[in-house]
Amino acid sequence: MINAGSSICGAAANWCISAPGTAILSTIVSGDIQGRLEKTADYVRLLIDSQNPTYDYGLKTGTSMAAPHITGALGLLMERFPYLDNAQVRDVLLTTARDLGAAGVDPIYGWGMVDLRRAIEGYGSLRVDTNVVMNQRAGGLKVWEGDAWDDWTNDIGGPGTLTKSGIGWLRLSGDNSFNGAVLREGTLELNGSNTLTSAVDVQGGRFLLNGSLVSTTLTTTGGVSTVSASGVLKDGNLTVNGGVVSFNGMQTGGTTTVGSNGLLKGIGTLGSTRVDGTIAPGNSIGTLTINGDYVQGATGVYAAELAPGGHSDQLHVTGTATLGGTLVALPEPGIYYLGEQFNFIRADGGINGQFAKTDFSAFSPFLQFSLAYGTNGTRIDVARGASLASAATTPNQRAVAAAADLLAINQGLPRPLTQLFPQQVGGVLDGLSGELHAATPLALVEGSRYVRDAVLSRRAGAVAPGADAGDATGAWVQALGGNSRLDGNSNTARTEANSNGLLAGIDHEFSGWQVGVLAGTGRTDVKQQALRAKSKIDNTHFGAYASHNWGGLGLRGGVAWSKHKVKSTRDVDFAGFRDSLSARYNAHTRQALIEAGYRFGGPEAGLEPYLQVARVEVDLKQINERGGAAALHGKVDDTGTTIATAGLRFDKGLKASFQQDSWLHLRGGVGYRRASGDRSQLADLAFANSTTTFAVEGAPIADSAVVAELGLSAWLTPRQQLELGYSGQYGSESRDHSANMRWSVRF
């Protein structure tokens, strides 16, 4: 209840508000006090002798009764709006008051009766320009998961302009009519119907329009603005001078202008539009509608996203589209098919002009994009672009690329290959090359020495101390393991081979000759790690050998034949393509060798210079890989390599001073090896369903290498011998290490 005794605003009406002040129940203090005054030259004071207070309640009227209501309300609102300053909280209280007396602010009741229920929902009016710094979480009844967020649901009017600062989020859910808004940072969201008397100016932060702006211009110079599907810009213009605007709603009765620093995108409907900045229909792939005419100026950019399958951003113009400026095409994930078409402009009233520039640099140069202008539309056509061979840097890559360039588009490989960029092509072509097949025969040539070394280590006349020289028949078994590496070069990949095996032989001496035969099995694993390619080779060996000594002069020789069952696998994996390939085929190795040496020394120690020549020939059968589009078929040329070695061997008996003969011998040697003939090999291959062949080279063997050997031999009994040995060769392009253990017996 209010009367003239509890609310008289007078000249302070603009800062005055009414509150209940009539017949307010209040505490009453009464009673009597006994005291006296004491006066001196320096002071006057009241001395209390006794007091008898009484306390009661009663109804009181006046401004003193009304003031505590206002003070309490202000305290509550300061807690509710911790991000507002004192004057702003006061204005919230004033502008949400319930009008009393004469309409508007009057000298009796001021703004009217305080209304806390309305006040906690935010301003009722912006009486002055107001800068809201949202940097604290709202208090009171507003609960939200964010740090600084609030929702003002009142209908806000007034002559003031709202400036939104701070990182927080302010939502206005009412139907507002104040004097425009400025967004500097954080988020400002308009959900109701807003008929503002000045523009909404987005300078930074994020602006959201889920309601409507009526007869109000939306101008952006920065930040990100989003007009949702329910957002409406009615009888108002949109000016994008900077920042990003995603327009997904409806513009009616206004026009749109995009300045040189602005970006407009979305899937909504706009009025007539002029673009001197950038327009990018869709929010990924989508259509933006211009209900009117469209003009793209000389500085304008149309950024169109193209997705595989012929899907693209599109601009639908109900009037006339006048083109100029630049078209920039942007890719989406996937594979683009040659022959695809992308319709990105449709103008019901016709097309005028053309783009001055086009930019397809975001796509592979192996695709060619061209524009086709029609009466009412514009499209992009996709065709084959630069050749893959133009990006190849090695002979192998150029050979593969030339064959791939000739493949028909429906053969599987051209589609993913044409999506690549030049810096990716080299590695992909290496993986497609099938170089493993060209490297395999060279790995077999390198591994052939294990059989030769076993043959040459059987020498006529090797008799244990105390043994009967008539023991003319011998048998032996040898286990071996080795690792070889062909380093490759700028054109070929590094190739490694790990071998193991078991050889056995029997020989007989007659008339100074030792003649024998051997057989064995083994396994060789060839790997090109960089190319994700490998072969597993099962080996079967047969051979014959003979040797003769004429005093210090020794002559040794032999022949061997090996059959190899090759199981190869390759994995080809690059962007948009994956294939696992395998093949099974046979190969054969034939070799013949002869060695002559002259030994100086006696039974306990000696030196032997020697000269050795070997001829190794390898042939591979037809290769037919199983797999997808990257499968290869073809043949590797026959390989013929001559290997000549000159060196010096030594042996030394190891015996104690009390022993007459040595049962333990140290042996070793060093030599120089030269390879001639086929040091590298070519494979003539073709892709699946293609007859166009290409030649790829495998990693070469070294033309020269240093060879070394070291071992121990021990006579376990007069008829049994155990030998342990190491041999290796070291070339500029290859390395080879092997170890063996052999047990032999004479009988």
Where are these regions (language model features)?
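Extracellular beta-strand/loop-rich repeat segments of large surface/secreted proteins
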Residues: 215, 230-237, 251, 255-343, ...
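Outer membrane beta-barrel transmembrane domains
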Residues: 590, 614, 626, 630-747
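Extracellular S/T/G-rich loop segment that most often corresponds to the catalytic His/Ser-adjacent loop
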Residues: 1-75
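Short secondary-structure subsegments characteristic of cysteine-rich extracellular domains
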Residues: 44-53, 185, 491-510, 631-639
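Extracellular repeat-rich scaffold modules on cell surfaces
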Residues: 39, 43-63, 68-69, 79, ...
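Short, charged, surface-exposed loops that flank catalytic or proteolytic processing sites
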Residues: 80-91
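Outer membrane beta-barrel translocator domains of Type V secretion systems
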Residues: 410-606, 723-747
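Outer-membrane translocation/initiation segment of Type V secreted surface proteins
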Residues: 83, 95-153, 157, 312, ...
